[in-house]
């Protein structure tokens, strides 16, 4: 680091130490509304920017984590004050007007420093305390176990083994310590292959298909240049092919555009030469690099920030950004790999340049298409843990956790999350989780509130002792899993089992703009009630009705049994009664079977002359009600299906429901397309 940069950093730090604790008479502008700006106080804490409105009836608060701040733009001073525009990584946009220029400058300098910490220990997760004890924190990190995930796939087996060749990260410092490799791949072959691969990221297993032995492996690009070759690397690919007895070849998928891969040859890198590798089929996909993706997202967000654009302007801007074309390219790669594994029974090796961006996207999309387990709540967490966190996706560099090179920032995992959402739109019953689940994961990738997405590798996280010092996001999401359930999810084989097969005709798969993600803070663009919440309420009401129907059917069955017993008694010859008694089958009694069967003649009247032996078969109405709680229910149940939202536990007057304080219009939620 240069002395000039250090001096600048020192000045920023000193200014930040003297940051204003609060600034009064600040106005928060709603850029998408004509409403008057809200007047309030702006607070700067060690972790958040907080705006509190002055209105005594609402006192609405807006909280923003410093780690969520992407850019801060100081605009020209006007008669109303100094304008500050804060753009966030979760696509929130705030415009505040500060009366005094000096205060605005102080806030600007402070936020620049607070939004770009220089050490991991300054991040929010190291001070975040959800009031859980040590044992609860440890249990949170144990929620997911990758060794169990590989066992679920059927590993180890005759073809694949768990290798400790990377113990203590001695071969590749961005790989996990435990990796599955073909049994035919010796330590010598693995070491030789690693030396011939960029960043020493040799081919390792990502996903295994138990029923046909096909696999998805991942690596980085080979250091082939124009003519270099490596015997061990060639043997490694042969070992992957032999681990699948059902196929005599493997696909090698390079996710880069061919022109980019060829340009890498000049730097001594490149791609596999089919003349040197036997029994491989090579395929280029054409996903652009991180710089193109960063610029594409920026262009799309500029369109989202337009005030009242015409439909043609919005669509033109969206098309010009190229964002959905990039999403389609990632999806096409995942579809190609899934078809190769499912339909051809062939194994696939996937790589890009270094094997931690496009490779992670493509492997995880393909796995999601192939395996319904990854379309469940816990399965999706495992997928991210396996293909992103464990295999060394550079979270710190890609999402700007610390102050660093802005050219390294790129929305790589954001694109994967959007691919999942696009699939959910096409297969609404195939995913156990809902849109809110995806949005919350995206939010916490940038929030640094939990320790899961820190650092660039497993090695760095262990050196920082992340699990001992922070909390796991997965435990938080699992605890609140009821909020993330998809009400349309069905355990139907046609929807949830096996491979998701997308339409082959391009016109049958429509890629949509995800307003729920990119416009989620623009309240005027969202329905007054979440579609998911509305459907969940309908599902709960339906479940209550089904339970009530089942209870009524059970009651009816019991009453019909009593009716049948009475009929049997009637058919027997009358005997003198040893003891006098009252009729136990009085047609005038309340709650008689006639109320349900509509047949008054089917229940005989009894006289005191009938014997005890026969009367033992008959229950009095009082005994019937006291012996079976289902039969002694309130009269509102006897009439059929009561109003489930207005049942008082005490049986008294209808108590107000939980939703009684909500807007009446919420029952008429407007279903909008995403």
Where does each model-flagged region fall?
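Cys-dependent protein tyrosine phosphatase-like superfamily
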Residues: 2-348, 364-674
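Hydrophobic anchor at the beta1->P-loop junction of P-loop NTPases
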Residues: 350-352
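Ser/Thr-glycine-rich phosphate-binding loops at phosphate-binding pockets of nucleotides
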Residues: 354-360
